[in-house]
């Protein structure tokens, strides 16, 4: 866990640290690698010690170990310290109204995350939790709009795009604009394992939304040169209360 320790001083300077946890974490599951991953809980604990507090759990490997794997990873995250926030796993449709929130320095942030697919493994009624797919735009719109009402800022993680490609596809651009229009302030893309471009989008209400289409890898065993180059997105979110009581967020 040397790499986590190396970045800890950087993370210590931030108020909030978010990461896409692309493998199931548990102390119960046997560790396994490609194509169906599971990771010892010590990995997540090392990230926690490094300063990570927000973990996105929605990606193409979420269903790798089926219902039993989901149950084990849910138990693991429930055992983590209370200041850990997870997003991207929902306990059925009745849970969709729950918006993960965190208030830091008087600023409330909502965290949502979605995935394009789960490697052909469908959601099953036997699963204790499920992801929300990017194709479920009606659900996503409801969540993002609700989050926009409840929080000062809405950060959305999206697991999308083409693996090992620096090219942003039309589906990414379309969904990014929709998310911005619905209320997202920051969109963090993952899945391609290589860097893709970033840009500002103008939302329907005039807000500016920042989207990083892919940050590449943080920690992996992939070894292509462009897979070894990842980015850490560092943003400043500012909330200003005017004398008349109105709040400006930027």
Regions found by a protein language model. Give the residues of each.
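Acidic, metal/ion-coordinating pockets
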Residues: 2-250
